[in-house]
């Protein structure tokens, strides 16, 4: 293993150097790992003999680093005891290790040749802007901000950017300032480059240059030229100019706008251009803008915060494959947003269905801010999908994204010879175009997936309702079976006693009507036809889930993207003597990718139409299931009501019978000298020997109650005796003379 100069073998103890992370003007940064604890730290060591002044500044850097504590500034830590020694008469600096590499490594990836994604740009703007603000508040000017001095660390799945190498060791005597920044002059503020006095605004220039490069893929001002050359051409630029390029004629073209292509959505471009105009102002006194008296900070920070606080909803219109973006006021309702969507797309608000990536429909009762996630920025990070509910067939595919002028130029004539330097720019845009086609498909596939998840939610709801329906149907069937058997038994028993006991035509008619209703309600519980339709839909959904078109089909496009990247890499590494080349191979890849996208989009929209058609069937079927369930519940309630009503009637009959039986017993016991014919004497001769059906009713035996009843009715005994005698004389008298009007209740 490689060791820092002066480190004796074994002197590091359990700490082992794993790799060299970087080399600066005066020092090396190496990764050390603890063999047992799996701890990792970055150690910065001096690799040169320093003058006393520079040695003092090195030590000063270490002291300052240990005082800093901010999430976006790399933290210093204690040097392990085993490594705590002097190298070249200066101490080591231990820092937290960031495993994501530096920003330069990210920018050098061929897929980022035309800039980073919007989410990455905004994340960098937030992190490094916060870090610079912290340093400036602590009276620290970095002076050497560049992609190599921005490291990335993954924290809970989120990339955090941190500033490293505060540059104190590079603050050498003013006479050799430029030479101390060898290799980093492209990001230096003009006043540093020209060896003039400077303020904190030098960091604004460097930061603006970095952000521009992250947006476009290259630096803002004549990026292919050395600073000594482009400074003379740029220093008289307009304050609003943020971009300069050299035309084929050699003329320099200035612009106050960001170049295309880039990944920023249209709503961010304008405020970002305004921010860059503040950061890239040549005049250090004007750079960053005036101090905001309310916020007590330069306008550039206020504008940066404004950009980062913008709530923008990105909506993919699945009917046109176009992305539309809206800036959301904090209190906007979803209905208001849908009205804006209607004006933009022509899709009526009532026909709009907005789905999240998980297939959940947006809640119309909640504000429009539900379309954006807290802390998530960029159209590449989160999308809402718009569907037209009035359509179930999405024709697709749609026209591919437009070619840039450069790419269109080589597509029209792939054999034209272009200078390698110019070709690099053209091929970079070609790679960006091919990657864009793949990303367009990926977004549409995600929209199809949201539609599938929505379908599965509808299907789950249908399944739940089906189970409820089947359960209710089975319960109704069981209750009807019980009701029919019980009413049949009641009718049979009623028929047996009506000739000598209690009878009522109204009650009999009511009971028979109940029996007929029960027969009718048995038809309500028949749901087989609905079960068949539901099972058919379940089968259809299962087939859609199994379909290969329900899975990602972009393998060929990814392969073509990689081929385009490989071609671009080869072009970048061509030796200088290869001055010209054609674009035949790159154009083949472009054409093949367009054809591949056309094919997979046809398959995607065909499958999507089936999903939406199936979902519409569920939507049409759900009301039928609800009606059937409502009818079953209504029938169930009616059956239970009829059963209860009949039971009340039976108990009312029993009450009457008990009352009559009690009355007879009381009269018989109080008229000891009176000849009272037995009950059998009241009945017709043919029935006199038969047992009365109500003789099983027990006469009340409570002594106190009977005594009270007798006392209360003494005055009525004479009248009752008369009635009984008349009954004995008139054998034809019966209980039919009683009032049965209660049956009509």
Swiss-Prot record:
Expression across tissues: Ubiquitous only for isoform 1, isoforms 2 and 3 are expressed predominantly in brain and T-lymphocytes.
SUPFAM superfamilies in alphabetical order: Protein kinase-like (PK-like)
Residues at which ATP binds: 21-29, 44
Positions where Phosphothreonine occurs in the chain: 23
GO MF term list: ATP binding; IkappaB kinase activity; protein heterodimerization activity; protein homodimerization activity; protein kinase activity; protein serine/threonine kinase activity; scaffold protein binding
GO biological process annotation, one example: cellular response to tumor necrosis factor
Keyword terms, alphabetized: ATP-binding, Cytoplasm, Kinase, Nucleotide-binding, Nucleus, Phosphoprotein, Serine/threonine-protein kinase, Transferase, Ubl conjugation
Metal-binding found in the keyword field: no
EC number annotated for this UniProt entry: 2.7.11.10
Domain writeup: The kinase domain is located in the N-terminal region. The leucine zipper is important to allow homo- and hetero-dimerization. At the C-terminal region is located the region responsible for the interaction with NEMO/IKBKG.
Protein name as catalogued: Inhibitor of nuclear factor kappa-B kinase subunit alpha
